[in-house]
């Protein structure tokens, strides 16, 4: 029965996710691994030029470069995230921020540079192996298993990570309560609103105990009334001690929930700092935010 359930869940994942853009890039097995994760334990602190982790700690990308047909897309970009903080990767369309984000997730390979997780080099690891080490990834596209209920979406991941049934159900109840989705636990995922779907996706990602979560356009497809839900979810993640890396085109909403931001412009880091420092920087205002922007 358990084998049958596992196969059913994997088949449903395949059918549900085949329309997503990320599947075209990574294949079903890699995206499944990115959603189920894997993972463990520690991180750290740091200071200015990378006000994130000190060397050997946290999720750190150094000197990333990527070109397509000899056209440089990113030039010497370094990004760091420590546990318990949210970092935003922002910039104009075509600036290279999405390329940087995808190099960190493992969706695309860097031409040069390194990516480390708590000091361990993961630069050459595929996406699914990064997931096993504790890097969770939520794509922009809906990734819920639509034919499953809310609780079965989360249980599907717990079955891969928690052998004991009683402990599995205890963890399930805890995640349903923490993300305030107990009242919809028996609802089919296909019937969820945008905000509810994001709650379920994040709860399911946490079932795998990741150290870091990478959020790709978390505000996309979300009604204005649900934006506050996303803010609360990110706060919950950092309060749990997870590091969060966000890339999104919704600048104001992103700046309101992060601790630090990096502004990518023309393939390099134009500015790194707190949201207040970012907004006050004249170059950032001139090239990206606009002179009238305010938080």
Give names to the regions the model predicted.
Residues 209:
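Conserved catalytic motifs of ABC-family nucleotide-binding domains
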Residues 105:
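Helix-to-loop junction immediately C-terminal to a conserved catalytic motif
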Residues 213-217:
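Catalytic Walker B motif of ABC-type/P-loop ATPase nucleotide-binding domains
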Residues 166-184, 235:
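Conserved ABC ATPase "signature" region
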Residues 90-92:
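The feature captures the beta-strand-to-loop junction immediately N-terminal to the Walker
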Residues 188-192, 196:
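Conserved ABC ATPase signature
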């Amino acid at each position: 029965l358990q084998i049958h359930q596992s196969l059913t869940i994997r088949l449903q994942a395949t059918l549900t996710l085949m329309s997503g853009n990320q599947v075209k890039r990574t294949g079903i097995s890699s995206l499944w691994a990115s959603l189920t994760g894997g993972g463990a334990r520690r991180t750290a602190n740091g200071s200015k030029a990378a006000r994130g982790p000190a060397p050997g700690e946290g999720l750190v990308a150094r000197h990333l470069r990527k070109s397509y047909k000899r056209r440089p897309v990113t030039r010497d970009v370094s990004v760091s995230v420590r546990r318990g903080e949210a970092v935003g990767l922002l910039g104009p369309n075509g600036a290279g921020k999405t390329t940087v984000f995808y190099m960190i997730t493992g969706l695309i390979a860097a031409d040069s540079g390194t990516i480390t997780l708590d000091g361990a080099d993961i630069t050459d690891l595929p996406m699914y192996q990064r997931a096993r080490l504790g890097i969770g990834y939520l794509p922009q596209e809906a990734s819920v298993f639509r034919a499953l209920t809310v609780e079965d979406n989360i249980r599907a991941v717990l079955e891969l990570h928690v052998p004991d049934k009683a402990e599995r159900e205890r963890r399930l109840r805890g995640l349903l309560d923490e993300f305030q989705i107990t009242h919809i636990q028996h609802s089919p995922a296909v019937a969820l609103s945008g905000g509810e779907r994001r709650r379920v996706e994040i709860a399911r990602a946490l079932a795998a105990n990741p150290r870091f979560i990478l959020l790709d356009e978390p505000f996309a497809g979300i009604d204005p009334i649900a934006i506050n839900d996303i803010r609360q979810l990110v706060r919950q993640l950092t309060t749990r001690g997870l590091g969060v890396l966000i890339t999104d085109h919704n600048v104001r909403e992103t700046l309101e929930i992060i601790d630090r931001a990096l502004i990518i412009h023309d393939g390099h880091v134009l500015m790194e700092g707190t949201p207040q420092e970012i907004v006050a920087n004249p170059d950032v205002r001139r090239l990206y935010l606009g002179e009238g922007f305010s938080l």
